[in-house]
UniProtKB/Swiss-Prot annotation:
Keywords: Kinase, Lipid metabolism, Membrane, Sphingolipid metabolism, Transferase, Transmembrane, Transmembrane helix. It comes from Trypanosoma brucei brucei (strain 927/4 GUTat10.1). It is an enzyme of class 2 (transferase). The lineage of its organism: Eukaryota, Discoba, Euglenozoa, Kinetoplastea, Metakinetoplastina. Bidirectional lipid ethanolaminephosphotransferase capable of converting phosphatidylethanolamine (PE) and ceramide to ethanolamine-phosphorylceramide (EPC) and diacylglycerol (DAG) and vice versa. Direction is dependent on the relative concentrations of DAG and ceramide as phosphoethanolamine acceptors. Does not function strictly as a SM synthase. Essential for viability of the pathogenic bloodstream stage of this human protozoan parasite and, consequently, can be considered as potential drug target. This is Phosphatidylethanolamine:ceramide ethanolaminephosphotransferase.
Length: 323
């Protein structure tokens, strides 16, 4: 058995491991990790689908939310619309955060080849931060994306394990006669490419993936949306709560699936936190060993401008003084 080098137990080794990776490297590598986790989740969905209790034998569990809220199966499509709206709003917010970053570093506003009155100003103007401005604006868009994607990857990975461990009877009408998966490879690819919309899986109950993304958008706008416009917080809060209602009222998930997902998402997003170095160093350990997708050292600034270090010796200084 090979003996680990002594340097691994020294302080210098762990200091190197705790040295933050460039933000650009984190963006690329954590996105790659998220794609890998999406494939893991797709496989877990297939396993859960096969392990789901027979609906003809096992009836849905008693649920207080089902007793209080009237059943409207079509509302699950409305929940998807809520998620789609929040996806668009989050992309818009991230772009506005990028404009705030450009304003912070002294770059001008971007310009379109053809100026469209009103439209160009709405999309390309800098909306100066008025709330939650204690957050440093430099690289705020990059750090916000790292925080969002790492939180999402962690939640999907834990969901892949939790929903396989315990199989619950599905309360959804579509899963009372669950469809058979004919082509497993095609199903996995469709699940990843369409974020689950291109395939039907049953039994993936604990916990709700739709609730995870709704709550992630809620937390994203609660922290960063307020930096763009004050109205984003109340709007996203109302949309997210309505989305929770749609999930339970459509009977696609038990109430516990939604409540647990809300708690875990909020706790994970807070634990990851906002840091000028990006993700916590413990998470960076998982991507530090990747042989591709960015450098491990900060040889350039995060704005992409090379840092030039000039060292003058004594003879050069004397020569310049004489000239």
């Amino acid at each position: 058995m090979a003996v680990p080098p002594v340097e691994m137990y020294s302080g210098s080794f762990w200091n190197r491991m705790r040295k933050p990776l460039p933000l650009r490297t984190q963006v690329i590598r954590f996105t790659v990790v998220f794609v890998i986790v999406s494939f893991i989740l797709a496989v877990a969905l297939q396993i859960t689908h096969e392990r789901m209790p027979d609906p003809k034998v096992t009836k849905p569990l008693p649920d207080l939310g089902f007793e209080v809220l009237h059943k409207y199966p079509f509302l699950f499509s409305v929940a998807d619309c809520c998620i789609g709206f929040l996806n668009i709003l989050s992309v818009f917010t991230a772009f506005k955060l990028y404009l705030l970053h450009r304003h912070c570093v002294g770059s001008g506003e971007p310009e379109l080849p053809c100026n469209i009155p009103g439209v160009s100003r709405f999309f390309l103007s800098v909306w100066l931060c008025k709330e939650n401005c204690r957050i440093e604006l430099r690289n705020v868009h990059t750090i916000a994306w790292i925080r969002f994607i790492t939180s999402y990857a962690l939640l999907l990975l834990s969901r892949s394990v939790i929903m396989v461990v315990t199989s619950l009877p599905n309360p959804d009408d579509l899963c009372q006669d669950p469809p058979k998966i004919e082509n497993r490879v095609k199903d996995v690819i469709l699940t990843v490419l369409t974020a689950g919309a291109g395939s039907i899986h049953c039994g993936d109950l604990m916990y709700s993936g739709h609730t995870v993304i709704l709550t992630l958008h809620l937390m994203f706008h609660w922290i960063y949306g307020a930096m763009v416009h004050w109205s984003f917080r109340p709007v996203v809060t109302v949309v997210a709560i309505f989305g929770y209602y749609c999930i339970v009222a459509s009977r696609f998930h038990y109430t516990d699936d939604v409540l647990v997902a809300i708690y875990l998402t909020i706790a994970t997003f807070i634990a990851v936190g906002h840091n000028a170095d990006g993700a916590p160093w413990q998470l960076q350990l998982f991507i530090r060993w990747l042989p591709c997708c960015g450098a491990n050292s900060r040889e350039v600034t995060e704005d992409g401008v090379p840092v030039a270090i000039v060292i003058k010796n004594e003879e050069m200084m004397n020569f310049e003084g004489k000239s």
